[in-house]
Amino acid sequence: MLHMDLFGPIAYISIGGNKYGLVIVDDYSRFTWVFFLHDKSETQGVLKKFLRRAQNEFNLRIKKIRSDNGSEFKNTQVEEYLDEEDIKHEFSAPYTPQQNGVAERKNRTLIEMTKSMFDEYKTSDRFWAEAVNTTCHASNSLYLHHLLKKTPYELLTGNKPNVSYFCVFGSKCFVLNKKPKSSKFAPKVYEGFLLGYDSNSRVYRVFNKDSGCVETTCDAMFDETNGSQVEQFDLDIVDN
């Protein structure tokens, strides 16, 4: 069974232009996925794509999902798709969020972890989605299931997680520039800082200080000696 809940709208639009987060939790392993949305109306499309991926990539036989009664979950398009896939849809009773407690608790945990990260590193609110994604990625590989004493990652995949590539959120990095060179004098590396990891993999998400964009790379060297660079960076380039 999968538990799911939508949070938002967040007061600050993320640097990716998102205001909502869709959290999905596997009942057995407590492995968690989080997706970021511009608008609530995107929920059904993201949900359909995820359910197909989960059944193919993780070999999950999804029999049931549980959500609240929000219109993003309770609508004709979603119900027709679930009927086609033979997936049962349970709803929590109105005004009783405890009936969707697994997803609600995970939401609170991710948000509280993100707030702590923001307080520690004085992070711009525009990076909230990147921070939530990072806390979700870390929790899947670091926290033990209270009964089974294994991480969600191991329970889902059967493999122990490799956390050797984890770095301090916001740490300075130097990234190999593999883009086509506009001139012979184009820099071979660019400076940025770490914002997290991509799709539960070892691909880094970094903020390119020159372009003001979030980019993904496997070719980065990190300097964690000076802590987070997020609080030291002039965010005018992000906000403009």
Predicted features along the sequence, with ranges:
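Active-site beta-loop-alpha junctions of metal-dependent nucleic acid enzymes
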Residues: 35-58, 212, 220-221
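RNase H-like two-metal-ion nuclease catalytic core shared by retroviral integrases
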Residues: 19, 67-69, 73-79, 89-113, ...
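Short conserved beta-strand segments at catalytic cores or DNA/RNA-binding microdomains
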Residues: 16-32, 51, 81, 109-110, ...
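Retroelement integrase C-terminal DNA-binding domain
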Residues: 63, 147, 153-157, 164-169, ...
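An active-site-proximal beta-strand-loop segment
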Residues: 1-36, 40, 180-181
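Charged alpha-helix within mobile-element recombinases
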Residues: 105-147, 191-194, 198-199
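Short, solvent-exposed helix-loop connector elements
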Residues: 116-128, 153-158, 176-186
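Residue-level signal for inorganic ion chemistry
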Residues: 30, 50, 68, 139, ...
